[in-house]
Amino acid sequence: MTLNICPEINAISNEIISTRRDFHKYPELGFNEHRSAKIITKKLTAYGLDVETGVGKTGVVGVLNPKHTGKTIALRADMDALPIQEMGDVEYASQNDGIMHACGHDGHMAMLLGVAKVLSEKPEHINGTVKFIFQPAEEGYGGAKYMIEDGVLNGVDEIYGAHLWNYQPHGTIGVKSGPVMAAADLFTITIKGKGGHGATPHGTVDAVVVSSHVILALQTIVSRNTNPLESTVVTIGKINGGYNFNIIADNVVLEGTARAYTEKNRQLIKTRMHEILTGLSIAFNAEISLEYEDGYPPTVNDKSCAEKLLHSATKIVGAGAGEPYLSMGGEDFSYFANEKPGCFFFIGSSPKDQEPLSTPHHCSHFDIDENALLVGSSVFVQFIRDQLI
């Protein structure tokens, strides 16, 4: 596969890779990205951008051509790492115990800094404004919401973000209109029965038996209530209950996650869960309660934005640009895309000589093909030039 890497990106390839490795070596959890923010601030300032710090707590924003009256396009990279102990044997392995960049956010920051450097070299050629958003706390804390509350989208016409994606090989770009990441909700179900001796079940309400019916019944939401062509997931990931082999449990707690690509199916899951649990409560004479917490909404790409991004990506990777490998993961870029037209795309980064999925995201051995950084940076540069030159 022939790749058309942007010459200016190619010229600073070592810097981009080195920056990524530095971020990887010193990862920071959500809303604690202080070292990362200082590095980003220093580089953006050196590039001549207008820089604002402390946006959304620990976020950084750099603006190129802030006084231009033309269109404003925002590019976003997330900054935070995960509470994982790195097990990979690489020279740039995490030096922060129990913290690891296991999802590629180190690369996202490095790419966007590379793009900022290239575009800032000839700002007079940019017929508009580019806002570089370095967002904290994507991993579960919803850092995007805090940045929006601090006004990061003021004056923005469109917003774009990307994710290094080990589910696709290097040299590919995945982009499409419509939903590309799922709503990611969580729930806790508490079942209260009546305990007793295992030899006298007739005087009890067995919370373990009730929980088994709950688990099976919830699976019918996906198999019988939602359109099989519309991806949805209901997963019970944790069960806690019981005391001993001969004691009937009076209490069981289930924890799980619900995922959907559309808001319609998200609400359907929630409604059916309440209905099913109400029915089972009556059937088994047990008290069943549901705590349902909305997570990130679905990430839905604007059709026009996706088409424009695909056009630019094709100039870099040719036939390697096309439909992404979709997952049911959640992404708080969705908050940005709900406020402004936007597009979230995927940069194939599966390590060399490995099949996609060999080193999945959130894995203690996670790593990427660092050449993907050059592809992603080139797509961003090409896109800005296509739109603002």
List the predicted regions and their residue ranges.
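Hydrophobic face of alpha-helices
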Residues: S13, I17, A37-T41, L112, ...
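Divalent metal-coordination and catalytic microenvironments
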Residues: F23, G62, L75, H105, ...
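Metal-dependent amide/peptide-bond hydrolase catalytic core
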Residues: A46, S212-I389
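Solvent-exposed residues in well-ordered beta-strands and their adjoining turns
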Residues: N65, D78-D80, Q135, T190-K194, ...
